[in-house]
Amino acid sequence: MVFVKTLNRTLYLEVAANEDVLSIKQKIEAAEGIPSAEQRLVFAGRQLEDSDCGLDAEATIYVNLELLGGAKKRKKKVYTTPKKNKRKPKKVKLAVLKYYKVDENGKITRLRKECQQPSCGGGVFMAQHANRHYCGRCHDTLVVDTATAAATSGEKGGKKGKK
């Protein structure tokens, strides 16, 4: 016995072990009225040829119909301008060194402030602007008083601070 799934229902056909696919197609034609030339039988993911034989007991065969036509073949597009290259950021060797400063004595000091938020954790440095420190990860901003910052650090302001 073989199960045959057609477009709208399932058929149960008695098939001998050595029977070929062509005779199964003729049985389907008698039961459903689908011409055997238009039938495409699929078993285990591959299409069966008319000369194939030796299907397993209680195998499920799917019936598909041959379709006419298809989509029109299209021309390959020809572009007039070349493709724009993506911008690759330059790799800076030892980029971590901009976060630390080493004295003559070998003492290491941090140049940037670490973010205090628990979501960031240790090792996340804040960006240093003229009047604030900004964390790019959690978007936390610490505003620095410009009068006290210039007096303590000895730094001048950004571009706007120059005269």
UniProtKB/Swiss-Prot annotation:
Domain Ubiquitin-like: 1-70
Keywords assigned by UniProt, alphabetized: Isopeptide bond, Metal-binding, Ribonucleoprotein, Ribosomal protein, Zinc, Zinc-finger
Protein's UniProt keywords contain Zinc-finger: yes
Positions annotated as zinc finger (C4-type): 115-138
Cross-link (Glycyl lysine isopeptide (Gly-Lys) (interchain with K-? in acceptor proteins)): 70
GO terms of molecular function: protein tag activity; structural constituent of ribosome; ubiquitin protein ligase binding; zinc ion binding
InterPro entries tied to this protein: Ribosomal_eS31, Ribosomal_eS31_euk-type_sf, Ribosomal_zn-bd, Ubiquitin-like_dom, Ubiquitin-like_domsf, Ubiquitin_CS, Ubiquitin_dom, Ubiquitin_ubiquitin-like
GO biological process: modification-dependent protein catabolic process; protein ubiquitination; translation
GO CC annotation terms, alphabetical: cytoplasm; nucleus; ribonucleoprotein complex; ribosome
Keyword Protease: no
Family: In the N-terminal section; belongs to the ubiquitin family. In the C-terminal section; belongs to the eukaryotic ribosomal protein eS31 family.
Entry protein name: Ubiquitin-like protein 1-ribosomal protein eS31 fusion protein
Gene that encodes the chain: ubl-1
